[in-house]
């Protein structure tokens, strides 16, 4: 197997696994918008979101993630994932200060995923196993 093929397979696996995690958080917005509203208030300081704004965010996020999973519009969709996951990771800064309290240790799993998303963005031109031809 050539280096190009091996790298392509690794990047495909990274894209799919990042998509799965992000998709679950998006599905959570549809299934339990109250939970998403609580997360926005607790971690981002954005309170007062009702069901409609959460659903709108979920729809937009779902559409972007589907395009991301297909490996299309790489600069924009891969960049979106890096930014959204980065903001989410950094917003939980207080949990990193006390890693052994409650479920805080789980928050550290966000760091390698963010690193994977950054690597995927940087290597996006080498991500060759996509649906259709990417015209950016």
Show where each model-derived region lies.
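Extended, low-polarity transmembrane helix blocks
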Residues: 1-31, 51-59, 63, 69-136
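Membrane-interface interhelical connector segments
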Residues: 30-46
